[in-house]
Amino acid sequence: VVEILVRGEAALRAAAERATVTVHSRWQADAPDAAMAAVTTAHAAAVERARALAAAGAIESWHADRAWVSHHREWVGEGLPQRLVFTASAAVTATFVDVDALGAWIGELGSAPEHEVGGVTWSLADETERRLSSRARELAVEDARARAADYASAAALGEPAITAIREPDPAPARPFGKARGGAEAAMLASADGGAPVALSAGEIEVEAAVEVAFRA
């Protein structure tokens, strides 16, 4: 009896169905009230728009942080007293199901200097990810069987039988192809105010791996 240890792998792809983005409203001023006033107005506009998009079905879920103020001292020149700067900040995070609506929203935000758009995180709907993960695991086991059969045949052994199955640490679903995020998405925030930003969702790859022991 010979033991055969193999690793089976599989990967499936599907078009991204969700896009999560965080909009930061941030402003600096010489007085805390001035910084807070600018951010409060900008943040309220972002919240109002997110609420409207959610009511229209373009946003699946969203949440908003409260505005807060911090301060730091800024160097302004040799021999000059440091300048005290106050920074107000707040954020809205939304998960979109409508990519066109997200592009339009980013374009709208570009008209206000207080807004900064973070990276876009693409993902699948929970049901889709569960379905693809299940199928990928099936294919990973089939891959392991095929590998074991190849080794058994090459070594002139009998048909291999499974004795143990172990799942390694799972790999999260990851963007593939044209999905955008990170620094690229941050640059989208600098688009001309009011002009919709073209976004391409691309695909998400769901992977599965399994370690299988056989005897032949």
Task: Set out the residue ranges of the language-model regions.
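Short, charge-dense linear interaction motifs
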Residues: V1-A216
